[in-house]
Amino acid sequence: MGTKSHFEETKAAVIDIPPAYNYIAVFLTFACNYRCSYCINYFEEEKFQKKTITGKEWTRALNRIKSRPDLPLTLQGGEPTLHKDFYEIVNGIRRDLGIDLLTNLQFDVNEFMKNVSPDRMKRKSPYASIRVSYHAEQMDPDEMIEKVLVLQKNGYSIGIWGVLHPASDGQVRDVAKKALAKGIDFRFKEFLGFYKGKLYGTYRYPDSLTMKNADRCMCKTTELIIGTEGSVYRCHHDLYQGFEPVGDIKDAAFRIEDIFRPCAVYGFCNPCDVKLKTNRFQKFGHTSVEIVK
């Protein structure tokens, strides 16, 4: 008799990722070591769910996903390494599922290397699997660079992304020069949101961020967005604002519906959903959602 698959053992439906999907966001926790003034998680009011599920619940649910080699699970937050079962989750996810990590690198590098093999977060990709967010108002750049070098020299796929906030643009660019000189991949991220009354960012639907009048529309995502309790959301706005989820990855019957959904809060979108950006192949012009009014 052959060995039963994970799906047969759990008697849960396989979660097929639609061909048009570009990203799988796994928000392990919203806890963070920092509180940056411009954090996109706090673009509007803080209403997102802070409860978390255990490592066993995460791995049981995530292992139902059937993805592609070019579409990993991206562990993020908050600071995902703060989840108490972080290493259990990383090492419990099926090996055929790729893993990327978004982090501020405020963890013990030696402990990380002891628990996570370099090959577990490495794949053929135009960007690093471990992506460090540099925030000038909170982080010591020299400490960050040294940690990145340690991981890089030990075979980890790692790079730094710096947010070009108007108040620290020059500082971020200076740190980038220092990192690049040491052989570190350093890239820039647009600042998204308002600063001194001005909206920053490049958006496909500029009137989706007026923050004045709510309008109706139909919206379809290209991302599987999983909140800290396993709930699945239409978009980042709904995740951060605590709106009703469209499903739960822990539900054995959950499947992704690649459809347009009605929305009544157009005008109050989250910048992450409507910004023009590169897709997972680093081709510019992608947007997380498609909106029809």
Which stretches of residues belong to each language-model region?
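Radical SAM enzyme [4Fe-4S]-AdoMet core and its adjacent flexible, acidic
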Residues: 129-251
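Generic structural signal for well-ordered alpha-helices
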Residues: 62, 87-90, 113-116, 144-149, ...
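Core AdoMet radical
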Residues: 23, 43-53, 69-83, 94-111, ...
